[in-house]
Each structure stands twice: as C-alpha cells, then as structure tokens.
Design a protein with these regions (language model features):
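N-terminal catalytic cores of peptidoglycan-degrading enzymes
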Residues: 1-83, 153
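Residue-level detector of intrinsically disordered/flexible regions characterized by low predicted structural confidence
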Residues: 17-18, 179-181
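Structured segments of extracytoplasmic/periplasmic soluble domains
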Residues: 35, 44, 112-123, 168, ...
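Long, well-ordered alpha-helical scaffolding segments within enzyme catalytic domains
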Residues: 50-52, 85-133
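Active-site-adjacent mobile loop/cap segments within catalytic or ligand-binding domains
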Residues: 72, 76-106, 140-166
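Acidic carboxylate-rich catalytic motifs and surrounding loops in phosphoryl-/glycosyl-chemistry enzymes
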Residues: 125-148
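Low-complexity, Gly/Ser/Thr/Pro-rich intrinsically disordered linker/tail segments
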Residues: 170-180
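Conserved small/polar residues in nucleotide/adenosyl-binding loops
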Residues: 184-188
Length: 188
C-alpha cells in the first residue's frame, strides 16, 4: 500500500490505528472549518490528546499534507468501521456555513481523489447521498461525517458538490459509467 506522491508536507499524527483492518474502498471528504495551511492542520493533529486525525489534508493554497499513512486508519469520521475502509481528507474551508472551499483547494481535492482511486483500484466514485448504503461500495463509495456524528461536516458547499466531484474524478479515471451530474438541492 502506497501513499500519494502529490503530498507536499508530512507530519504523522499519533492519533491512528495501525494497521487498518479493511481494504480501502471508500473516501470521506471533510471540511476543516478554517482557511488553514497543511502545516497548521498537522499541528492540530499532532497532540495525542486531540484524538483526531485524517489521512490527508488540503490547505487553502492547494498544497496536500499527509498525517496518517494509507496503511493506517485515521480517527476522522467518528466511526471506526468507516475510517478503516476510507481514505479521509480534510479540506480547508471557510469558518461558517456553507463552509466554502476555494478553487485551489477544490482542484487539489480532485487531483488527490483521482490519485487515491488509481492506486487503490477504485474504478469509479459513486455518490447517491444515501446513508443506508454505508459499507456497500459497489453502490456508493463516498461517505460524509454527518452520517456518523451530529455535525454539518463536510458543510453544505462540499456536500452539494459530491455528485459533481464524483463526475469530475470519474471523467479523469476514464469511467465508462459516467452519469450526468445531479446537484443536491436542499428541501425548501
């Protein structure tokens, strides 16, 4: 199992379980709730008392940090089963709803997801916005933190773009099963 060659900064967190106990077949995108750098995020995950981490983080400038190697489980989604099967990615965002992500961070997220999928044999990203499909990567292999804890993570901005993210990644993966992008709209 390898790590992403796109990483610009590494600061391994003690907050992890080693090794992960499941094959990587899922991705979980989180919002940081701050327009921070990869170094700042590394410092957030450094103290053992924090009891939180992610595999990767993307700074406001589009740089990519690694905090937990892919062979290990991060402590990111408030759910051990999800974190054992998922690569978790924290993305710098605004500090309040909709927790918007800037263009540099978004572009780096797409690049990182394409790389993760290629290296881990994930042929396409699947998003149905359906919590009941957790753990069924043949139907949906993107999960969100809000499904496991009382949080708004990944925020409205990223949540409403999950179908678009999957479509952009799948196009670059050469997926033959690309569906039109259906954006999520909040109920009135």
């Amino acid at each position: 199992m390898s790590n992403s060659p796109l990483v610009n900064y590494t600061k391994i967190s003690p907050n992890k379980s080693s090794p992960r106990n499941h094959k990587i077949d899922t991705v979980t995108i989180h919002c940081v709730v701050g327009q921070c750098s990869v170094e700042t995020l590394g410092n957030v995950f450094a103290p053992a008392s924090r009891q939180a981490s992610s595999n990767y983080g993307i700074g406001y400038d589009g740089r990519i940090g690694m905090y937990v190697e892919e062979k290990d489980r991060s402590w990111c989604s408030s759910n051990a089963a999800n974190d054992n099967r998922a690569i978790t990615i924290e993305v710098a965002s605004d500090t309040k709803e909709p927790y918007a992500v800037n263009a540099k961070a978004y572009a780096a997220l797409i690049d990182l997801l394409v790389d993760i999928c290629k290296r881990n044999g994930i042929k396409e990203l699947k998003w149905k916005a359906d919590k009941s499909l957790i753990g069924q990567p043949d139907k949906q292999n993107m999960t969100v933190h809000r499904w496991f804890a009382n949080k708004s993570c990944p925020g409205t901005y990223l949540y409403e773009r999950h179908a678009q993210i999957a479509s952009e990644v799948n196009k670059r993966l050469g997926s033959t099963n690309i569906k039109p992008c259906l954006l999520y709209t909040s109920p009135s």
